[in-house]
């Protein structure tokens, strides 16, 4: 004889939740991946003393909506003294206008003599610009190759000495 056992209906628990929060921080970075030290053998009163190599500059970004442009600049902290003498008693400096940069192997070598957004000295050169168009390139990167010259005709009485300086490379996005 068979007895009927009724199947029990499923029982559901309450609903538990987990809140998920994710943040992608805005970033704009510049890295010199090669050519972090450039040497020059200078000749007096010579317009084109070439640097020993090139620098590769990578600018990468992850931006918030509303940004519309990225500008990459090379600049010195002083227009009058981009490179300073090593020898005590030598007070002659190489100005930023004597340092010239060619970008990506094309066009002229241009002096570092413009005002950058990073300091008021007329010691900079914009080396790149990227327009941001909506969300099509809000995350991206650009690579620029810089070649260098020092024009010693800018300082016709430049004494024999070693001269050292630091070229800053920085990017800015707007607005």
Spans of features found by a protein language model:
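Sequence contexts marking disulfide-bonded cysteines in secreted/extracellular proteins
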Residues: 111-113
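N-terminal small/polar-rich segments of proteins
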Residues: 7-109, 129-175
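Bacterial N-terminal signal peptides
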Residues: 1-3
